[in-house]
Amino acid sequence: MRPPEIPEGHADTSGQFLVAHPKMPANIFAHSVIYVVSHNADGAMGLIVNRLAGAGPLGKLLEAFGLASKAQREIKLYLGGPVGIGQGFVLHSDDYAGASTRALKKGLSLSTGLDVLEAIARGRGPRQVRMLFGYAGWSPGQLDGEIARGDWLLAPADTSLIFSEEPDKVWEEALKHAGLPL
């Protein structure tokens, strides 16, 4: 199946960062860096990569999904966006592929099934991982309008920022990648 045609004037930002403009009003997207998973004529979907929500043992997360595990590895959970808060996503390096894995750009993959969590618990998962819940979504043309209005700056995606252990510094670094250092 072919992806939908991209209308004239539409820029496909898939595989790039959306970096919140410094003047964006205080809301969930202020100071956000979003990895754009897909952007086509049907709309866009992305994941905020720098909004830490909490941390805890991987075993507790697996138990919440009904999976027995003694995994004590500490994991961090991130808010991927305000849509579908009950949905979980694992944005990871492309060295793992399971039944629910979708290959993305820039050496990244996205998994949405329990298989990736089980693989991580067994030490057979991807080398780099960002666990998120929820996502950012835009209707057709909405993201294009927000970019044209100046709400978002575009920057090349950088895996060192996606998987950074210092999410509070990611926005400022991404601004530099977008050509707008503070």
Curated annotation (Swiss-Prot):
It comes from the Bacteria. GO terms for cellular component: cytosol. Belongs to the UPF0301 (AlgH) family. PANTHER family: UNCHARACTERIZED PROTEIN YQGE, UPF0301 PROTEIN YQGE. This is UPF0301 protein MCA0413 1.
